[in-house]
């Protein structure tokens, strides 16, 4: 990933975190890294559901939409990272959990929110 793409990605992740707070989501971790992957945002909603967020941005749909870029391989890496997060933070193990995707396209200031994007 080039420097500019990385910078835009970080901006969109921060934008998503701010927006999620307006949706009553408490951010418990950002950029959680583990062997083989990273989870952009991890949040807790008002009914104590732990949500693992992947944030995606696409300037154009030439190579597919932002939501289409979460491939089965990427899903597996996110699932493995989520398991690692739960091992390191056992206080969240009793929570309901889900994987959501927040995606920005073009000049959107608010993401589109795909809940229950995939299952583990």
Swiss-Prot record:
Q: Which top-rank group of organisms is this from? A: Bacteria
Entries under InterPro entries matching the protein: Restrct_endonuc-II-like, tRNA_endonuc-like_dom_sf, UPF0102_YraN-like
Output the SUPFAM superfamilies linked to this UniProt entry.
Restriction endonuclease-like (SSF52980)
According to the record, the segments passing through the membrane are none
Pfam families linked to this entry:
UPF0102
A GO molecular-function term, please?
nucleic acid binding
UniProt record similarity statement = Belongs to the UPF0102 family.
- UniProt-recorded name of the protein: UPF0102 protein Tcr_1695
Q: Which organism is it from?
A: Hydrogenovibrio crunogenus (strain DSM 25203 / XCL-2)
């Amino acid at each position: 990933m080039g420097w500019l793409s990385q910078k835009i990605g970080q901006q969109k992740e921060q934008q998503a975190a701010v927006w999620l707070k307006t949706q009553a989501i408490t951010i418990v971790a950002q950029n959680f890294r583990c062997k083989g992957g990273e989870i952009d945002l991890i949040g807790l909603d008002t009914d104590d559901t732990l949500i693992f967020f992947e944030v995606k941005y696409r300037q154009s749909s030439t190579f597919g939409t932002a939501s289409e870029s979460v491939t089965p391989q990427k899903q597996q890496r996110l699932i493995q990272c989520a398991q690692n997060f739960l091992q390191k933070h056992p206080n969240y193990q009793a929570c309901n959990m889900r994987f959501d995707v927040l995606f920005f396209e073009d000049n959107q200031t608010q993401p589109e929110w795909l809940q229950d994007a995939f299952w583990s």
